Amino acid sequence: MATAFLPSILADASFLSSIFVPVIGWVVPIATFSFLFLYIEGEDVA
């Protein structure tokens, strides 16, 4: 029963790549560089 349900989920989830590509390409680097910048510029770094 699960094997018949899985292809319909994968067919309906084809829009996910258009969501994850900008997230991985823009949001993750912005968050990473922002955190690293704030960490490096902080006063209490040993």
From Swiss-Prot:
It comes from Trichormus variabilis (strain ATCC 29413 / PCC 7937) (Anabaena variabilis). GO terms for biological process: photosynthesis. SUPFAM superfamilies: Subunit VIII of photosystem I reaction centre, PsaI. It comes from the Bacteria. The chain crosses the membrane at residues 20-40. This is Photosystem I reaction center subunit VIII. Residues 1-11 form a propeptide. It is a single-pass membrane protein. Belongs to the PsaI family. Keywords: Membrane, Photosynthesis, Photosystem I, Thylakoid, Transmembrane, Transmembrane helix. InterPro entries: PSI_PsaI, PSI_PsaI_sf. May help in the organization of the PsaL subunit. Signal peptide: none annotated. One of its GO terms (cellular component) is plasma membrane-derived thylakoid membrane. It holds the Pfam family PSI_8.
